[in-house]
From Swiss-Prot:
Keywords: Amino-acid biosynthesis, Branched-chain amino acid biosynthesis, FAD, Flavoprotein, Magnesium, Metal-binding, Thiamine pyrophosphate, Transferase. Mg(2+) binds at residues 445, 472. It is an enzyme of class 2 (transferase). Residues 394-474 are annotated as: Thiamine pyrophosphate binding. It holds the Pfam family TPP_enzyme_N. The lineage of its organism: Bacteria, Pseudomonadati, Pseudomonadota, Gammaproteobacteria, Enterobacterales. Thiamine diphosphate binds at residue 51. It comes from the Bacteria. SUPFAM superfamilies: DHS-like NAD/FAD-binding domain, Thiamin diphosphate-binding fold (THDP-binding). Belongs to the TPP enzyme family. PANTHER family: ACETOLACTATE SYNTHASE CATALYTIC SUBUNIT, MITOCHONDRIAL, THIAMINE PYROPHOSPHATE ENZYMES. It comes from Buchnera aphidicola subsp. Schizaphis graminum (strain Sg). This is Acetolactate synthase large subunit. Contains 1 molecule of FAD per monomer. The role of this cofactor is not clear considering that the reaction does not involve redox chemistry. The gene is ilvI.
Length: 571
């Protein structure tokens, strides 16, 4: 039995949980932990340049691997700087444990230097939070925190550690618990047998069924089960933004992404379907448009591990609470007993007609560089094998629509909170987790400046990623909305004083390249990928057409079938 200080217990607990990397920034309240990182060893710490970036790095690490991302920050501003990243992970159901320092127990509530109520501030955006009151409780609290973060619907958990709990003079027996029990927490993983059978009967009788898959498929590692199930019933599959890669984008049954900027065929198929089999989704407002007009003839079958997500926005006719992987396995077994399954020939014919609209067409003859062309060229050169992170805005939507994701965990983006500044640190987290992977961050001139300081972190740890900056000298999505909804009044959506990104990147010790014409686009991309393969971080600053908009775009207040397409309204 080991006798350890609180700080040493923290490191030993991380090791026992199999944690190899943590992301953080030191400060007074956590200096004992930082000392233990040296004396105990066994965990690699990545020193970021801002605590928000630490959370995004841990987030990218978690999304690309399915492992838990771990963050270490000090009290006060260190903790509050992490809030945006915690909220980002919470909205997208990403497993994360955030260890925050706190002032000494005797000072809590007295407005001490760098004191803040991290438990209270984070409460709405975490699965759970712990304030450690006794040093000897550290092992069991850590085990509970990691269990909570990774089970049921995953999400972030905060552990707040007062400074006195960590002191070297405060030593206790380190007892690692074999088992834990958390009162009132027992996630349902096995779906109700009767509900599953009922849902399958309805789905097999449908004439216009559609499978709507989301990020829950990726979280539960059930992409293969989804593919097998979809093939057995020959049903079209659409995904949410978070679900891209859950079903192969190159599969004949894929009709791509639905929602505000989803494809014409996906949105039309949803609207005119008679049965929607929704699995691992929460019917976010960006995927439903006007709820009063939502899929008026569809019976809703909703599978989710989180019971609070079912019928929260769209009422489910057949609710199934359970793990997506287990439910799909059960359905696959039940289907084996079916003698005949509908061909859905007429339904596929309708979808084929919607596909002929070619909603993703754009002006390929333009003299200006089109963002669509950049993403398509990137896909061609990488053959779809890369891990792609993005920031938030037009470039995010262009990437989602024009880069074909055929495997899960290859698309890393802030879908729920929509956090600008996410892309670069997330890419660094992915690269740390998967050193041999090709990691590419697609960003814009607005987003990249939110956390551009992490180019320094990349240099310190030799994290080679490719950054594509789609530079239109404006906040593209804001400008698009101003064009389409605010009569073209561009209020504060232009970037008039951008830095010379190439020189800035070079000052951090990386390679910067500029692209101004269509003729040099592919050549520079090939060069950038070559330099990347040689172990360099490469920043490609691409001057794109600043008038380009993302289409399709659903009409506010309309049904799923009402959208703007190639600058004209269709329905």
């Amino acid at each position: 039995m080991e006798i350890l200080s609180g700080a040493e217990m923290v490191i030993r607990s991380l090791i026992n949980q199999g944690i190899q990397h943590i992301f953080g920034y030191p400060g007074g309240a956590v200096l004992d932990i930082y000392d233990a990182l040296k004396t105990v060893g066994g965990v690699e710490h990545i020193l970021v340049r801002h605590e928000q970036a630490a959370t995004h790095m841990a987030d990218g690490y978690a999304r690309s691997t399915g492992k838990i991302g771990v963050v270490l920050v000090t009290s006060g501003p260190g903790a509050t700087n992490a809030i945006t990243g915690i909220a980002t992970a919470y909205m997208d159901s990403i497993p994360m444990v955030v260890i925050s320092g706190q002032v000494a127990s005797s000072l809590i509530g007295y407005d001490a230097f760098q004191e803040c109520d991290m438990i209270g501030i984070s409460r709405p955006i975490v699965k759970h939070s712990f304030l450690v009151k006794r040093t000897e409780d550290i092992p069991i609290i850590f085990k509970k925190a990691f269990w909570l973060a990774s089970t049921g619907r995953p999400g972030p958990v905060v552990i707040d550690l007062p400074k006195d709990i960590l002191k070297k003079t405060n030593k206790y027996n380190f007892i690692w618990p074999k088992n834990i029990h958390i009162r009132s927490y027992n996630p349902t993983t096995k779906g109700h047998q009767g509900q599953i059978k009922k849902a399958l009967r309805i789905l097999l009788k449908a004439k216009k069924p559609i499978i709507y898959a989301g990020g829950g498929i990726i979280s539960s590692n059930s992409s293969e089960e989804l593919r097998i199930f979809a093939e057995k019933i020959n049903c079209p599959v659409t995904t949410s933004l978070m679900g891209l890669g859950a079903f192969p984008g190159n599969h004949i049954q894929s009709i791509s992404m639905l929602g505000m900027h989803g494809t014409y065929e996906a949105n039309m198929a949803m609207h005119y379907s008679d049965v929607i089999f929704a699995i691992g989704v929460r019917f976010d407002d960006r995927t439903t448009n006007n709820l009063k007009k939502y899929c008026p003839n569809a019976t809703i079958l909703h599978v989710d591990i989180d019971p609070t997500s079912i019928s929260k926005t769209v009422s489910a006719d057949i609710p199934i609470v359970g793990d997506a992987k287990q439910v799909l396995k059960e359905m696959i077994e039940l289907i084996k007993k079916e003698k005949q399954i509908h061909s859905l020939k007429e339904w596929w014919s309708s979808i084929g007609k919607w596909k002929k609209i070619k909603s993703l067409e754009y002006n390929k003859k333009s003299n200006k560089i089109k963002p669509q062309k950049i993403i398509q060229t990137l896909f061609k050169l990488t053959k779809g094998t890369s891990y792609i992170t993005s920031d938030v805005g037009q470039h995010q939507m262009f990437t989602a629509l024009y880069y074909q994701f055929n495997k899960p965990r290859r698309w890393i983006n802030s879908g729920g909170l929509g956090t600008m500044g996410f892309g670069l640190p997330a890419a660094l987290g992915v690269k740390l987790a998967l050193p041999k992977a090709t990691v590419i961050c697609v960003t814009g001139d607005g987003s990249i400046q939110m956390n551009i300081q992490e180019l320094s972190t990349a240099r310190q740890y030799n994290l080679a990623v490719l950054i594509l900056n789609l530079n239109n000298s404006s906040l593209g999505m804001v400008k698009q909305w101003q064009d389409m909804i605010y009569s073209g009044r561009h209020s504060h959506s232009y970037m008039d004083s951008l830095p010379d990104f190439v020189k800035l990147v070079e000052s951090y010790g990386h390679i910067g390249l500029k692209v101004k014409t269509n003729e040099e686009l592919e050549e520079k991309l090939i060069l950038a990928l070559k330099k990347l393969s040689e172990g360099n971080l490469v920043f490609l600053d691409i001057q794109i057409d600043d008038s380009e908009h993302v289409y399709p775009m659903q009409i506010q207040g309309g049904g799923m079938n009402e959208m703007w397409l190639r600058k004209k309204e269709v329905s």
